[in-house]
Swiss-Prot record:
Compositionally biased spans, kind Basic and acidic residues: 200-211
Biased composition (Acidic residues): 227-240, 249-260
Taxonomy, superkingdom: Viruses
Record's protein name: Uncharacterized cullin-like protein R337
Amino acid sequence: MISNRNNNTSIHNATVENVEGKYKSIGDISTEMLNPVIIDKTVWTIFNNLNIDVQYPLELECYLNIVEKSYNIIYENKFSINWLPTMGTACFRAILGDKNVTITCNILQAIIISLFNDTNNLSASSVYNKTGIQYDLSEKILESLFEANIVTRKYSSNDTVYIVNTHNYTGDTNINIINEFIELFETPVNSSNSSVNLSMDKKSDDSKIQETDISTAETDVKFLGDEDYVDGNEDCISDNEDAKKYDSDTDSDLGDLEDPNEPKLIVDSCSDCSESDSEEY
């Protein structure tokens, strides 16, 4: 089995250099938020997993990149990680109206919440075009945000548009919206356009709605991934004293993973969202 607890400690202590590139706009990156659970798929079969090829928003993609590079260093490129977005959790700090709200959600919900950093309104078709998440599933995720009072909705002739609820949010300051999605997942969504053309243009017909952005702070993220062997069937090791710097052309560089005294780029994280090391399976 993969030694998640030891590896997560290495990730937490890693030095991340946010070099010039597509991740530069993210600013400070905190690896202490990351608690990935990596499972060897040869010993744990996951049933009923949706086969979704998700395009992650930039910040989530960056953190996945950090985890993958960490495992490449520790296991010397022995494994290939396949992320399962239906089985992870995240914690956001967001500003809704005059309230600072802590939102605990699953990764699919986190993907859409992250999109609201760039626009104040989304529809299922625009989510599909941005992320590749199927229309019906996108509608259910957006509906779960509506049920949690995070967004309002507006019906149009083409699609239902969901708008950040920055004026009339009356909910709690600490909410867990995972159950809203679970309850909606097996139920049909009452959509005004269930047969939308998924190849439609990415621009929403409601793009003229007055903008009011949702502001999210750092996220506390736990992803679930499974690993494929690249070659060989040797047992996994918990650490690698001779781990070398992984040199690649990607935009985030990791320093020495083994030295806990290395300086880290850490921003204020959500204290209510902090989690202990992932359980070792």
